[in-house]
C-alpha cells in the first residue's frame, strides 16, 4: 500500500499520474469489457477503421432518413452489430495477437449476422407466418440468439447473461408445465424472443437504434474536441485551491465527463488517472481517493441532461418528453453530488489537508478562451429542451457542431504553437487543421461505433429478459410476492425492491441496467401505489449504485486499481460517499415533489431544496464524524438522525431536523470557544 504523503506538501500536476499512465489500459481491460478489443495494425487497421466509420455513418443515415418498418430496420441494425462485434471483441482478453481473427470468430460473425439479415430481408413473410413459423425459422432464431449470447459474454459480461439464462430456463419450464412438447415450447419462445418486438428487437434496441447510438457518436466527437481536459481544468480552477481541492476537482470533473461518457468504470479510469494521484499526494488515504473517483463517476450516469443515455429509455418507458426527464433529474443529482462534495470537504478539514497553490492553477483567462469547447453540448441541450428539433436531429446537429468546434480547436492549437504569425503560417494551420479534423472525425466515428456495439448488445439482451418476463407472466408473480411480503408496510416493499435492483444491476451497463429495472422492478412499485415517474427513478438509481456497492462494485474496484488500495475498503468508502443515492430515492418515492411532480407553489420547491440540502449535509457530517471539529459516536448518530428527519417530507419533521442539526453546530461552536479561551 502506498505511503500517505505529508499533508502539507503542495500539490502540483502529480508525477504519480505519469507513472501510472501505462497502467490505465491494463485497468480498463480488467474492469471495463469495452476496452477488451482486438489489436489491429497496418492495412488491417485501416480496413477495420473504414468499416467501423462507415457503420457509424450508416447508423446516422438510417436513423435520420429510414422509414422502413421496425422488423426490417432493427434486425438489419443487429446484423451489422454482430459483424462489428466479432471484428472487435476477441473470445478472451488474453487473445491479443495483432491482426488475428480466428476461423471460429469468422464463422460466428457470418452465421450470426446472416440470421439477423435473413429476418430483415424476409420480415413481411415472418409477420404473415406469425406463430406458424417453420423449423428452419426456429433454427435460425436459436442460432441468432446463441451468437448474440456469445457476443454479450465478450463485450458486456456474465451478470446480464446469468439473468437472461435463468429467465429463458424458467420460460421453458413455464411452457412445458402446460404439457407442451419440447419443440412447441422452443418454437413459442423463439418466435417471441427473436421474431417479435417483444424480444431482441423490442423497446430497448429500438430506443438504442433511434436515439442512443447517435448520442454515443456525439459523445465520441465531443471527447475528441478536448472537452474532458477543459472540464478538469475548469474544476481545478474552481475548487483546486480549497482544502482538499483535488478531491473536489474529481467530483466536478467526473460528474461532467461521466455524463457524456456513459460508463462509470471507463470514466473512473480516465479521469481517475489524473485525479487519484493528486488526491493521494494531498494526503487522502488511497481507499478514500479511489472511492471519491468511483462515486463521482457513477454519479455521472444520473447527471442530466444526458444521464449516460438512460434518459432516452426512461422517456420511452414513462411516456413523457426527454426534456422533462432531464428536468426531473436535476434535484436528485444536485443532492447526490452535494453529499459527495460535503464528505470530501469535511474529510479534508478533519485531516487538515491543503489544496493546490493558486499560482499553479489554470488561469480564468485561458479557460474563457477555451469555453467554446462546450458549445456543442449547449446546442444539444437547447435543441432538445426547446423542442425545435427531434432528439435524433438534435444529436445530428450537435455532431456537426462538434466537428466544427474540433476544426477550430485544431486550427487555434496550431496557430498558438507557431513561432511566427503570417499569412503563410495561417494557410498551413488551416491545411493542418483540416487534416487533423478529418482524422479526428474518422476516429470519432470508429469510437462511436465501438461504443454502440456494447450498448446495442446489452439492450438486445435486456429485450430478451423483458420478453421472457412477458411470456411467463413473471412480473405479476414477482409483484404479488413482494406486495404480500410487504403487506401494508410499503417501506418494506421499497427495501425489497432496492435489494432486487442492486442484485440485478451488478456489472450491467447503464442502458441495459435501466431496461431490466423498468421491466422487473418498476411495476412492483407502481402496483404498490407509487407514482409512475418516482417508481422509474427509484429503480434507476438503485440499479446504477450497484457499480459502487460491494461485492460487485466494478467502478470502485477500478478506482482501487489506480489508487493501489484495498478493493473492498474502497467499495465501502464509495458507498458511504454516495449515501445520498441510497436515501434520496426513498424520499422522492414518498414525496414526488422532489422530482417536480404535483408541485403547487414555488415555496414548496424552495422548502424541498433547502431542507434536502441541509439533510444531506447532516448525514454526510455524521458519517464523516466532523462539522467544526471531530464528533464522538453519540453526536454522529444524532447528526444522521437529524439529517434523515430533514429529508422526510413535512414541515414538522423539517423543524425537528433543524433543531437537532443547529444544536450540534451550537455545541461544537461552544466547544471550540472553550478551547480557545483555555489557550
Regions found by a protein language model. Name each.
Residues 1-131, 138-142:
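Conserved, well-structured core domains of diverse proteins
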Residues 2, 6-46, 327-451, 554-644, ...:
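Long, contiguous bundles of hydrophobic transmembrane helices that form the permeation core
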Residues 49-53, 72-87, 104-113, 138-147, ...:
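Hydrophobic mid-bilayer segments of alpha-helices in multi-pass membrane transport proteins
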Residues 62-67, 88-99, 125-126, 144-158, ...:
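Membrane-water interface regions at transmembrane-helix termini and the short interhelical loops
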Residues 135-139, 198-211, 237-251, 282-288, ...:
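Membrane-interfacial loop-to-helix junctions in multi-pass transporters
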Residues 150, 154-155, 163-180, 186, ...:
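Core transmembrane alpha-helical segments of multi-pass membrane transporters/permeases
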Residues 219-223, 254-263, 295-301, 462-466, ...:
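Transmembrane alpha-helix interface/packing and boundary motifs in multi-pass membrane proteins
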Residues 232-300, 306-313, 319, 510-542, ...:
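Hydrophobic transmembrane alpha-helices that form the pore/transport pathway of multi-pass ion
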Amino acid at each position: 500500500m502506498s505511503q500517505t504523503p505529508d499533508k502539507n506538501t503542495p500539490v502540483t500536476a502529480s508525477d504519480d499520474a505519469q507513472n501510472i499512465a501505462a497502467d490505465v489500459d491494463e485497468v480498463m481491460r480488467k474492469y471495463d469489457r469495452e476496452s477488451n478489443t482486438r489489436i489491429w495494425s497496418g492495412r488491417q487497421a485501416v480496413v477495420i477503421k473504414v468499416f467501423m466509420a462507415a457503420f457509424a455513418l450508416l447508423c446516422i443515415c438510417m436513423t435520420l432518413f429510414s422509414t422502413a418498418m421496425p422488423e426490417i430496420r432493427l434486425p438489419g441494425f443487429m446484423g451489422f452489430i454482430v459483424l462489428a462485434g466479432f471484428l472487435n471483441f476477441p473470445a478472451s482478453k488474453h487473445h491479443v495477437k495483432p491482426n488475428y481473427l480466428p476461423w471460429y470468430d469468422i464463422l460466428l460473425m457470418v452465421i450470426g449476422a446472416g440470421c439477423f439479415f435473413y429476418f430483415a430481408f424476409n420480415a413481411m413473410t415472418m409477420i404473415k407466418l406469425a406463430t406458424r413459423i417453420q423449423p428452419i425459422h426456429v433454427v435460425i432464431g436459436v442460432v441468432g440468439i446463441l451468437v448474440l449470447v456469445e457476443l454479450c459474454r465478450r463485450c458486456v459480461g456474465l451478470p446480464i447473461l446469468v439473468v437472461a439464462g435463468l429467465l429463458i430456463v424458467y420460460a421453458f419450464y413455464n411452457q412445458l408445465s402446460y404439457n407442451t412438447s419440447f419443440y412447441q415450447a422452443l418454437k413459442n419462445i423463439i418466435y417471441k424472443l427473436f421474431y417479435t418486438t417483444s424480444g431482441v428487437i423490442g423497446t430497448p434496441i429500438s430506443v438504442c437504434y433511434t436515439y442512443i447510438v447517435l448520442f454515443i457518436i456525439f459523445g465520441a466527437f465531443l471527447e475528441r474536441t478536448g472537452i474532458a481536459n477543459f472540464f478538469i481544468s475548469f474544476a481545478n480552477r474552481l475548487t483546486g485551491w480549497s482544502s482538499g481541492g483535488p478531491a473536489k476537482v474529481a467530483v466536478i470533473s467526473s460528474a461532467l465527463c461521466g455524463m457524456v461518457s456513459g460508463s462509470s468504470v471507463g470514466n473512473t479510469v480516465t479521469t481517475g488517472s489524473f485525479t487519484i494521484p493528486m488526491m493521494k499526494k494531498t494526503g487522502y488515504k488511497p481507499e478514500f481517493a479511489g472511492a471519491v473517483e468511483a462515486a463521482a463517476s457513477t454519479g455521472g450516469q444520473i447527471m442530466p441532461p444526458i444521464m449516460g443515455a438512460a434518459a432516452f429509455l426512461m422517456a420511452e418507458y414513462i411516456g413523457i418528453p426527454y426534456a422533462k426527464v432531464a428536468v426531473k433529474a436535476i434535484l436528485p443529482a444536485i443532492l447526490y453530488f452535494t453529499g459527495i462534495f460535503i464528505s470530501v470537504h469535511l474529510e479534508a478539514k478533519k485531516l487538515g489537508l491543503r489544496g493546490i497553490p493558486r499560482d499553479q492553477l489554470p488561469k480564468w483567462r485561458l479557460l474563457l478562451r477555451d469555453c467554446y469547447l462546450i458549445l456543442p453540448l449547449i446546442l444539444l441541450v437547447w435543441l432538445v429542451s426547446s423542442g425545435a428539433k427531434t432528439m435524433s436531429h438534435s444529436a445530428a446537429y450537435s455532431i456537426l457542431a462538434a466537428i466544427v468546434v474540433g476544426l477550430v480547436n485544431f486550427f487555434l492549437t496550431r496557430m498558438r504553437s507557431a513561432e511566427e504569425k503570417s499569412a503563410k503560417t495561417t494557410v498551413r494551420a488551416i491545411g493542418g487543421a483540416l487534416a487533423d479534423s478529418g482524422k479526428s472525425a474518422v476516429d470519432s466515428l470508429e469510437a462511436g461505433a465501438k461504443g454502440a456495439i456494447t450498448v446495442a448488445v446489452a439492450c438486445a439482451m435486456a429485450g430478451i429478459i423483458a420478453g421472457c418476463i412477458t411470456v411467463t407472466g413473471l412480473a405479476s408473480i414477482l409483484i404479488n410476492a413482494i406486495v404480500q411480503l410487504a403487506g401494508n408496510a410499503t417501506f418494506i416493499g421499497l427495501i425489497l425492491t432496492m435489494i432486487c435492483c442492486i442484485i440485478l444491476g451488478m456489472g450491467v451497463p447503464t442502458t441495459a441496467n435501466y431496461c431490466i429495472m423498468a421491466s422487473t422492478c418498476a411495476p412492483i412499485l407502481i402496483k404498490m401505489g407509487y407514482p409512475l415517474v418516482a417508481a422509474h427513478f427509484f429503480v434507476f438509481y438503485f440499479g446504477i449504485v450497484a457499480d459502487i456497492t460491494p461485492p460487485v462494485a466494478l467502478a470502485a474496484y477500478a478506482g482501487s486499481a489506480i489508487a493501489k488500495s484495498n478493493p473492498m475498503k474502497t467499495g465501502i468508502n464509495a458507498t458511504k460517499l454516495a449515501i445520498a443515492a441510497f436515501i434520496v430515492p426513498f424520499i422522492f418515492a414518498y414525496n414526488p415533489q422532489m422530482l417536480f411532480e404535483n408541485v403547487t407553489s414555488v415555496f414548496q420547491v424552495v422548502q424541498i431544496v433547502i431542507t434536502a440540502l441541509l439533510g444531506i449535509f447532516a448525514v454526510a457530517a455524521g458519517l464523516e464524524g466532523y462539522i467544526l471539529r471531530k464528533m464522538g459516536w453519540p453526536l454522529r448518530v444524532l447528526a444522521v438522525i437529524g439529517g434523515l428527519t430533514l429529508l422526510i417530507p413535512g414541515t414538522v419533521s423539517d423543524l425537528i431536523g433543524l433543531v437537532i442539526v443547529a444544536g450540534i453546530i451550537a455545541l461544537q461552536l461552544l466547544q471550540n470557544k472553550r478551547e480557545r479561551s483555555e489557550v
